[in-house]
Swiss-Prot record:
Protein's organism: Pseudomonas fluorescens (strain SBW25)
Biological processes annotated in GO: protein quality control for misfolded or incompletely synthesized proteins
Main localization category: cytoplasm
Function per UniProt: Cleaves peptides in various proteins in a process that requires ATP hydrolysis. Has a chymotrypsin-like activity. Plays a major role in the degradation of misfolded proteins.
Catalytic reaction annotation: Hydrolysis of proteins to small peptides in the presence of ATP and magnesium. alpha-casein is the usual test substrate. In the absence of ATP, only oligopeptides shorter than five residues are hydrolyzed (such as succinyl-Leu-Tyr-|-NHMec, and Leu-Tyr-Leu-|-Tyr-Trp, in which cleavage of the -Tyr-|-Leu- and -Tyr-|-Trp bonds also occurs)
HAMAP family linked to this entry: ClpP (MF_00444)
Protein name: ATP-dependent Clp protease proteolytic subunit
Length: 211
């Protein structure tokens, strides 16, 4: 599995106590309780929080497909606070974002690093945002493998292919050349919200909802 190096230092971030707030709605039919994320899903809001891994990616893909079926013409809002994670899991989210009909607006809250930054940049053009104190970090993928020399060679070729593919897609979404992306992702490259906007990873920094 190919991952990013930053997540290894930040994988212990967990929701406080693992508690999820509940929201109670009242209607003519009575009361119904939702966890906060399910309630926000009704408003077409999806949260990508924590390390990107297969289980989380499957849930996000399912939510994207569900919201497309609900209304294929209304935007979906993806909020990202992630140190990054699995490349293959992240690419499943990316492909689903591009596959569905609704525009997916992305917003960074907190941090969007590595695969998190890649998914932030993959939002619909003109609809990619950061909150003012967000941090964005781009870099090349990290992979490790042990085994026979021939197997190591196979995996080395694979990670080079993945790096080129990620760089090509980031160049497409950011407006940079492939050479510029290769240079700027050679090492961990941290950016403020304003720097991410100037670089083309997002379209605007927002501090309040539009009136």
């Amino acid at each position: 599995m190919f991952r990013n190096s930053y997540i290894q230092q930040n994988s212990d971030i967990q929701a406080a106590g693992g508690l999820v707030p509940m929201v109670v709605e009242q209607s003519a039919r009575g009361e119904r309780a939702y966890d906060i994320y399910s309630r926000l899903l009704k408003e077409r809001v999806i949260f990508l929080v924590g390390p990107v891994e297969d289980y989380m990616a499957n849930l996000i893909c399912a939510q994207l497909l569900f919201l497309e079926a609900e209304n294929p013409d209304k935007d979906i809002h993806l909020y990202i606070n992630s140190p990054g994670g699995s490349v293959t899991a992240g690419m499943s989210i990316y492909d689903t974002m591009q596959f569905i009909k609704p525009n997916v607006s992305t917003t960074c809250i907190g941090q969007a690093c590595s695969m998190g930054a890649f998914l932030l940049t993959a939002g619909a053009e003109g609809k990619r945002f950061c909150l003012p104190n967000s941090r964005v970090m781009i870099h090349q993928p990290l992979g490790g493998f042990q085994g026979q020399a021939s197997d190591i060679e196979i995996h080395a070729k694979e990670i080079l292919f993945i790096r080129e593919r990620l760089n090509t897609l980031m160049a497409k979404h950011s407006g940079h050349t492939l050479e510029e992306i290769e240079r700027d992702t050679n090492r961990d490259n941290f950016m403020s919200a304003e720097a991410a906007r100037d670089y083309g990873l997002i379209d605007a920094v927002i501090d309040k909802r539009p009136a």
